[in-house]
Amino acid sequence: MGDPSKQDILAIFKRLRSVPTNKVCFDCGAKNPSWASISYGVFLCIDCSGSHRSLGVHLSFIRSTELDSNWSWFQLRCMQVGGNANASSFFHQHGCATKDTNAKYNSRAAQLYREKIKTLATQATRRHGTDLWLDSCAAPPASPPPKEEDFFASHASLEVSGATQASAQPEPASSTPWGLETTPEKHEGGPGQGPSVEGLNTPGKTAPAEVSSIIKKKPNQAKKGLGAKKGSLGAQKLTNTSFTEIEKQAQAVDKRKEQEDLARGTPKEESIVSSLRLAYKDLEIHKKQDERLNLSGQKKAEAERLGMGFGSCRGGISHSVTSDMQTIEQESPTLAKPRRKYQEDPEDSYFSSSSKWSEQSSSRYFDDPMELRSSHFSSWDDSADSYWKKDSSRDPEPATKSTGSSDRPSSRRKPEYEPVGNTDEAQKKFGNVKAISSDMYFGIQSQTDFETRARLERLSTSSSISSADLFDEQRKQTTGNYNLSNVLPNAPDMAQFKQGVRSVAGKLSVFANGVMTSIQDRYGS
């Protein structure tokens, strides 16, 4: 016995898949299963087929119904005698309703069903051999091939059938002319005359000629079925109606539509006119309010800009802001002097002097802004040099006043020297000397030498000394008495750095004053 061909396999599985119970998976119920268990003759999905493979071939032998082509006749008979419906009924009869794959196919019911499928497939193979279909599943009856329809033959058959129907019912069709012929004879003749019998001698060929049309049959059939009911959808006979009246009615309807359109258009025009009237009234109200308030030009502009006192005031109840509006002009402000947190050295007194100069310049700037602006921006390059000359002549006080210098010890404190009143004495005293020092000029050389010798003699017995011991300074200085000279290092380049800072600060102050004046001129007035 040879193996089945591919066409035989496809034909058998096509027939088996057409069964509704075989269109879903036997285990999970998924649609369109493409795998099969030969041991049980059931159809499975690809996921359930994997779980069946893990059970082993001794429990379930899996094959694909689409990919595998080496099926044997015994395997095909197993699928034919099995099926999802037979397997489910057998398992239910034996009380196996579990969903667990291992428990289900290792049960006693699964073992009995495997043996049953094997026995039935062996018997079918011996009995039918290589036949495709078994007795239980015979081949479906072959449907006859569709015949080609002839268009002209079909129309000819319709005409023949219509003629036979007309000839089959000659009596109802011929009764109508006979009745029409007898009625006038009754009116024309007397009551003794009988009906005419001329139509009886004529052959029956004339009747089909008069009743051959299908249109005359329909009223007779409609009368039989529907009768003379009111509101029917059948055709009605036209009475004597005048078309002039219909035309007049149509014209009346057209005129009515035109009138409705005109009536709809008038409210729109009225609404437009009313809106224009309201706009004019609003303008008149605003004009009256302006006349009543008597606002000047500047106050009116400010009121319009702020949106106050127009349209929202209720007469005699609410308060109008414009009645109490006053124009406030800014006077020259007095700038408060900032408090100094730290004390300064005479060397660093520039910052205090520059602040005073900026205050004076700002006040003078506000008094005459145009003159100062032109003077500042015309002499931009020379402003720093001229400023320092003015500063030295205008504000000499910070150079001599220093609040923190009194807290220093007498040894390191810079003494307040008074210049020699008479310059002739200095010229007489140092006229022939090539070089002199400040100590020689002020006569303090002997005093400093005496203090230094006394201090060294006092510390001669000590093993080590410090700078604080040498100059009699206190160990700890108070936190509030720090000076800028104690913070900044005493380096030779610090003088140049201070000079650069002073020049930059002067230029920035001049530029800031010019900017502030331009802003106040533009936005202040």
Swiss-Prot record:
Residues 293-305, 387-398 have a biased composition (Basic and acidic residues). Keywords: Cytoplasm, ER-Golgi transport, Golgi apparatus, GTPase activation, Membrane, Metal-binding, Phosphoprotein, Protein transport, Transport, Zinc, Zinc-finger. GO terms for molecular function: GTPase activator activity; zinc ion binding. Residues 10-126 form the Arf-GAP domain. It is found in: Cytoplasm; Golgi apparatus membrane. GAP activity stimulated by phosphatidylinositol 4,5-bisphosphate (PIP2). The modification Phosphoserine is found at S232, S242, S271, S275, S332, S379, S437, S460, S462, S464, S466, S467. Residues 160-233, 249-271, 293-364, 377-428 are annotated as: Disordered. PROSITE patterns: ARFGAP. Residues 222-233, 349-363 have a biased composition (Low complexity). This is ADP-ribosylation factor GTPase-activating protein 3.
